[in-house]
Amino acid sequence: MKLLKFGGTSLANAKKFLCVADIIEKKNKKEQIAVVLSAPAKITNYLATIIENKIDDEVLKKINLAKNIFIELIQDIKRIQPLFPYENTKSTIEIEFNKLKKIINGILLIKQCPEGIKPIIISRGEILSVDIMKNILQSRNHEVTILNPVTNLLSIGNYLDSTIDIKESKKRIKKINIDQKNIILMAGFIAGNKEGELVVLGRNGSDYSAAILASCLNAKCCEIWTDVDGVLTADPRIVSNTYLLDYISYQEAMELSYFGAKVLHPRTIEPISQFQIPCVIKNTNNTESKGTWIGKENNPSDNSLKGVTYLDNIIMFNISGSCLKDSGNTIARIFTILSRESMKIILIIQSSSENQINFCTFEKDIDYILLILKKEFTLEIKEGLLNDFNIVKNLTILSVIGSNISEKNNIASKIFSSLGSSKINVLAIAHGSSKHSISIVIKKENLLQGIQNIHNTLFFKKTIINVFLIGIGGVGKALLKQILKQEKFLDQKNIKIQFRMIANSKKLLFLKNSINLNNWEENFKKSKEKFNLTILNELLKNTCDSNSVIIDCTSDYILSKQYISFIKKGFHIITSNKKANTDSLKYYSEIRTTALKENKKFLYETNVGAGLPVINTLQSLFSTGDCLISFKGILSGSLSFIFGKLEEGVLLSEATKEAKKLGFTEPNPFDDLSGIDVARKLLVLAREIGYSIELKDISIEPILPERFKKYQNSEEFLFKLKELDSFFSERVNKARDIGNVLRFIGSIEKNGKCSVKIEEINSNNPLYKVKNGENALTFYTNYYQPIPLVLRGYGAGNDVTASGVFSDLLRIIL
């Protein structure tokens, strides 16, 4: 005997009803099957609103609407399965809803709904589900036995939330003579009290019914069919990289359920655990999925964690005062009164040294708990033995579940570390009270980030980097291509780079999980989300996981002024944008102070030398105590190319035009030839070395006369540049005559004096052969003399710059 239970989502429409019938048929070929059915999706909730709201004439309209849902359902079944007895089923539906209408008319007369009538109203969906399934199976030539839960399941409790007496119910069902060839059907959610009245079993009542019937029939297995593949390691609506659990123990399932996982209600687990009946969670939308097996305790060698879950809308009561220490029965009185009033206490945290106790409960109970506690301890409060009750609202309890979790090394420390990385404070912790769970209390606003951090730390073997990319010009696109190309390599290194946002100055593409880099451009074009700083900051507010990074591949000054704000939100910053590092010394220092305080990285390797390891090399060098004697460098790839062409006899205007065509220059080459870009890079280096200077402190010897500033149009600028061709040719020839070349060089002296100018250098200089877009940097230091440290390579181009950004990205996790 095997028991199958199908929830409301599995019976949501005609196709799903018939799919359930197919599953029942297939299972019945191997062994006898008992089936427990819920009402079709949303029907029970719909009927519940009838008894929860004011009973008036509008209720009859709602009854008709509910009836029509069932009529449409069986009409669709008839179209798909022609032998289905539509007229007989329709007649049953009409009879049931006519009963409801008579009940409602009676309620309208007495102007109230008796408690005993409420379960009759809200249980119609389950009863009709059984009748519809009976008719489907009989039309397929199957014999069916229907068990009446009112007469066979004895309940204890109130009309709307009863508990089953398993022992008595077992006796009753044992007396029934059921043909072993018959398929057994029973409505879930329903039972009968000792007076024979219909009652319902409260939340998850159908699952509970299934567990009870499985126990009563001595079923060898209880299958709970729903709309998910089984038990996952976390809520997939919140955490993107969850995975299916093959097996969990009864106790683990109980803990998961108790702390909020939508697996099974604890009441459902109790009977299957008591009678050692295995339970399988299966998916009617994916019948091939193996599901999750719930059974006896795990093998002691099983060290795997099983899930992270949460309870929302929690409050924490803080009760303090001298009587907690001096009077031993005060704490007992607190929990006796709460137990007597059926108030659920989720966590208890006691601190005897501070004469206080904290307990967590649901927010909905706050007013009543406050009322009964004040009434109970009126005298103690009046005498000052108890302080006013302090209540902390808007909390969440996160719980990590796993067998013998309290004995596992480093689990608690990993939890705290993952939360600490995002500045999430832990208000309370329960560790050791249950050997299968660790629970922490945090603010509700940190739920999303907290559960993602913990899950990624404990359950995902790969190190995840969440990227928010702003700027998809040449460098941004090259970066995306490089990361896509390296996916296999990164996978081998257990690194997963997830792009959560891709944006330009006009719009953005954002996904809660991860953007597929194979078709990001197509999806970006489809996106209708606008981009501005207000929208960006709102989006970032609730999306920061551990290892979340903002990459700025723009040259936008306003965006660079947001870096401190981004860091405070929990993001690392990687930027090829030089604006922040060349802003005021005050802002430059504030970024670093904030990054240090928030334990975040601010990386900008490509600010100087594109993909060359300049910044990282300098930081490593000077952190070991080395000191600069002097520096000279060619810091512009575009000017390296142009001056190299001048050396070959190419005219200035033609060399500049060729550099622009190859993508070495800014849109208007004046920006390159002005020398300001080289000055900014020199400023970054000087500050990195330790000099507290501003951009205005750098002496720039202009390449061009002042009058060229007015030519903002690139074509006009290049045309006018011809006026300087002969001057530069003469200057180049003069240098060549004595064996020298011209180079545009940035210099830093030991006293911090910085300059940018054209210099004439000979063949002994390390910069002599640097051209064709190369950068070269020569550092004379205490450690590197008389031969300098030289860094040389291409310092311009999208690919090398993107490579530098990519390198910074991997440094986030190193």
UniProtKB/Swiss-Prot annotation:
Pfam families: AA_kinase, ACT_9, Homoserine_dh, NAD_binding_3. Its EC number is 2.7.2.4, 1.1.1.3. Its cofactor is a metal cation. Na(+) binds at residues 605, 608, 610, 612. Coiled coil: none annotated. Keywords: Amino-acid biosynthesis, ATP-binding, Kinase, Lysine biosynthesis, Metal-binding, Methionine biosynthesis, Multifunctional enzyme, NAD, NADP, Nucleotide-binding, Oxidoreductase, Sodium, Threonine biosynthesis, Transferase. Residues 470-814 are annotated as: Homoserine dehydrogenase. InterPro entries: AceGlu_kinase-like_sf, ACT-like_dom_sf, ACT_Aspartokinase, ACT_dom, AK-HD, AK-HSDH_N, Asp/Glu/Uridylate_kinase, Asp/hSer_DH_NAD-bd. NAD(+) binds at residues 474-475, 503, 554, 797. Residues 1-248 are annotated as: Aspartokinase. Residues 249-469 are annotated as: Interface. It catalyses: L-homoserine + NADP(+) = L-aspartate 4-semialdehyde + NADPH + H(+); L-homoserine + NAD(+) = L-aspartate 4-semialdehyde + NADH + H(+); L-aspartate + ATP = 4-phospho-L-aspartate + ADP. NADP(+) binds at residues 475, 506, 554, 576, 578, 663, 666, 797. NADPH binds at residues 475, 554-555, 576, 578, 797. A sodium ion is seen in the structure; a metal ion may subtly affect the relative position of the nucleotide-binding region to influence enzyme activity, and could increase the stability of the enzyme. L-homoserine binds at residues 666, 677. The active site is at 681 (proton donor). It comes from the Bacteria. Pathway: Amino-acid biosynthesis; L-lysine biosynthesis via DAP pathway; (S)-tetrahydrodipicolinate from L-aspartate: step 1/4; Amino-acid biosynthesis; L-methionine biosynthesis via de novo pathway; L-homoserine from L-aspartate: step 1/3; Amino-acid biosynthesis; L-methionine biosynthesis via de novo pathway; L-homoserine from L-aspartate: step 3/3; Amino-acid biosynthesis; L-threonine biosynthesis; L-threonine from L-aspartate: step 1/5. GO terms for molecular function: aspartate kinase activity; ATP binding; homoserine dehydrogenase activity; metal ion binding; NAD+ binding; NADP binding. GO terms for biological process: homoserine biosynthetic process; lysine biosynthetic process via diaminopimelate; methionine biosynthetic process; threonine biosynthetic process. Bifunctional aspartate kinase and homoserine dehydrogenase that catalyzes the first and the third steps toward the synthesis of lysine, methionine and threonine from aspartate. In the N-terminal section; belongs to the aspartokinase family. In the C-terminal section; belongs to the homoserine dehydrogenase family. Homotetramer. This is Bifunctional aspartokinase/homoserine dehydrogenase. It comes from Buchnera aphidicola subsp. Schizaphis graminum (strain Sg). The lineage of its organism: Bacteria, Pseudomonadati, Pseudomonadota, Gammaproteobacteria, Enterobacterales.
